[in-house]
């Protein structure tokens, strides 16, 4: 038995138990109730089946129908408690038969059996019902933890991970954990109790027969443990292929226009079919192995029953150690213990699949949060003086060479309060990276970024970002109403404040003309709106937040002339009295900036006003002339 438990439980289930230690504590009361009802179920099951012995003795007239014994006093020297209890039970049945007849005694014992079975099944139901809140609660908690972790991770994490893979972990892997691991909770908290009580009962009935039975259990456990380990390896591969499938679906949905424009439907279909077929082949192997659990445990259980029948028959026929009804009761108890053991074997196939998924989930849950507060961060509620880049250098690690590739090199820049500074340059020169350092989406490798003389690493991240408003090239909106999108950064805003923000952003007119006004749903990512409308809604959102620092990252580069005019007008209203850092592709939009910094290969190569830079006849002048052609 010990070897069996080691191969079936402690090998594949050690990780399982570690997972439960992480997630079960909030549900201890349900766990306690489940254990209580499982104990009741086991005890009631034993007593209900124990009623079979006198029934069989009456039916088959063993010892003349029932043993004839004298009543034993409990304080007498009559042997063990078991012997006294058994003797007195038969004594009362014997007296009942004498008074009421054997058929009546049979009916009463049958009613007792039915009543005990009713209580047993009730306890069994309650034990399973109390597991459900644990199972569903843990799955909910895992999803919450993944989502919260996603929100806490830095943007750098997602530049190295595919969105489809993350979605697959949130959906497919969590679902697999629920199906494979959480479905085994009932097995874990119920079956050990049943096995313990039934095993003790088997020893009480016949320790010789039980000892003989134990000899056959370890080989069964070893076989199932080996299969379970192989199943986990295949499951990890299957879940990785599922992530590839989800990633391709996500990429396809985001690139449908390009796919259609290049007539690449057939090409993408073939590629998806290859990925999907690989997943199918792998998951098929996993499921075939999983389906082995029931027939294999059924076959091994039958072998065990046959062996016990043979050895038990010897004890009955040759030695007379136990009688026929007792051996039948023993077989019933043995069959009862086989079912929980079958569940363990089934779990040894199921749980490795869930553990493989949990490994992938933990890659997110245990990922290091690089951007976080210090133990004692400085708090800030207002912006008073300036933003400063002091000898700032920023690099990312190249995946192939593992070397640092510098995007920014020794940047020095002071942005006084109330001023507008524009960053221009070719694609890849580091403009967007530079503005991403202000709200601390990334941390610099060298130098420091300061707000009012305080390093942003020393500030509370929440306080820092509450000072900053963002309007990006791609207006990021949510599948909600106009109202909910505009008040995203200020949930307590009044309807009047929301309307005023929309008016300043030149969005009020088209919002009020929509079907339900400010309560109109704008669709996934604002898909029901034009590019200019989406941008004006995002500007209204920034206006309502009313931040002292504003970051504009090519906010008008993807718009037509009319939309650009409306958006530019809204931006100019937004920029009044605010400190603004603008990344610009169209130089015409930043002519009036207080200072323009020209970036080239990660360095500031020129700086000054528009007129000053034109007179320099340098890099900025070349960019300007190219846009005039």
At which residue positions do the language-model features occur?
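Helix-loop-helix
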Residues: 201-215, 224, 289-359, 364-365
């Amino acid at each position: 038995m010990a070897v069996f438990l080691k191969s079936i439980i402690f090998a594949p289930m050690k990780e399982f138990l570690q997972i439960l230690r992480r997630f079960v504590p909030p549900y201890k009361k349900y766990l306690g109730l489940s254990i209580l009802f499982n104990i009741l179920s086991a005890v009631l099951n034993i007593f209900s089946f124990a009623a079979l012995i006198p029934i069989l003795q009456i039916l088959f007239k063993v010892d003349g129908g029932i043993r004839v014994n004298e009543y034993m006093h409990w304080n007498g020297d009559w042997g063990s408690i078991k012997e006294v209890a058994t003797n007195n039970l038969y004594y009362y049945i014997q007296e009942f038969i004498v008074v009421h007849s054997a058929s009546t005694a049979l009916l009463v014992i049958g009613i007792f059996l039915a009543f005990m079975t009713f209580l047993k099944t009730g306890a069994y139901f309650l034990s399973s019902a109390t597991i459900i809140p644990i199972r569903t609660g843990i799955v909910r908690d895992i999803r919450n933890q993944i989502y919260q972790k996603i929100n806490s991770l830095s943007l750098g994490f997602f530049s190295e991970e595919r969105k489809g893979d993350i979605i697959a972990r949130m959906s497919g892997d969590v679902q697999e954990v629920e199906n494979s691991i959480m479905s085994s909770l009932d097995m874990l908290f119920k079956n050990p109790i049943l096995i313990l009580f039934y095993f003790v009962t088997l020893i009480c009935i016949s320790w010789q027969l039980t000892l003989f039975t134990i000899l056959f259990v370890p080989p069964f456990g070893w076989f199932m443990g080996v299969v379970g380990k192989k199943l986990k390896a295949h499951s990890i591969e299957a879940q990785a292929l599922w992530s590839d499938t989800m990633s391709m679906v996500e990429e396809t949905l985001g690139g449908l226009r390009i796919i259609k424009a290049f007539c690449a439907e057939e090409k993408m279909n073939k590629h998806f079919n290859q990925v999907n077929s690989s997943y199918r082949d792998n998951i098929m192997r996993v499921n075939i192995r999983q389906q082995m659990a029931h027939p294999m445990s059924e076959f091994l259980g039958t072998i065990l029953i046959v062996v016990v029948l043979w050895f038990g028959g010897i004890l009955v026929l040759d030695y007379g150690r136990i009688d026929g009804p007792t051996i039948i009761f023993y077989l019933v108890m043995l069959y009862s213990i086989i079912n929980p053991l079958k569940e363990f074997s089934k779990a040894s196939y199921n749980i490795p699949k869930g553990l493989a998924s949990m490994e992938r989930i933990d890659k997110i849950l245990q990922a290091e949060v690089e951007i976080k507060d210090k133990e004692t961060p400085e708090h800030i509620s207002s912006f008073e003086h300036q933003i400063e880049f002091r000898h700032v250098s920023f690099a990312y690690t190249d995946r192939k060479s593992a070397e640092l590739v510098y995007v920014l090199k020794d940047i020095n820049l002071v942005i006084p309060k109330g001023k507008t500074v524009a960053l221009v340059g070719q694609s890849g020169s580091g403009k967007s990276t530079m503005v991403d350092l202000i709200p601390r989406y990334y941390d610099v490798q060298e130098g420091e970024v300061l707000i009012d003389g305080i390093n942003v690493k020393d500030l509370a991240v929440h306080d820092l970002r509450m000072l900053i408003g963002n309007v990006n090239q791609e207006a990021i909106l949510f599948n909600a109403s106009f109202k909910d999108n505009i008040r995203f950064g200020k949930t307590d805003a009044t309807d009047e404040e929301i309307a005023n923000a929309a008016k300043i952003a030149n969005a009020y007119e088209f919002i009020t003309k929509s079907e339900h006004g400010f309560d109109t749903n704008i669709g996934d990512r604002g898909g029901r709106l034009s590019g200019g409308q989406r941008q004006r809604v995002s500007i209204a959102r920034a206006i309502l937040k009313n931040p002292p620092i504003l970051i504009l990252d090519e906010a008008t580069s993807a718009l037509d002339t009319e939309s650009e005019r409306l958006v530019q007008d809204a931006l100019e209203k937004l920029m009044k009295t605010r400190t603004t850092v603008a990344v610009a592709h169209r130089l015409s939009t930043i002519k009036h900036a207080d200072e323009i910094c020209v970036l080239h290969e990660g360095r500031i190569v020129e700086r000054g006003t528009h007129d000053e830079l034109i007179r320099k006849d340098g890099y900025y002048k070349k960019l300007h002339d190219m846009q005039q052609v």
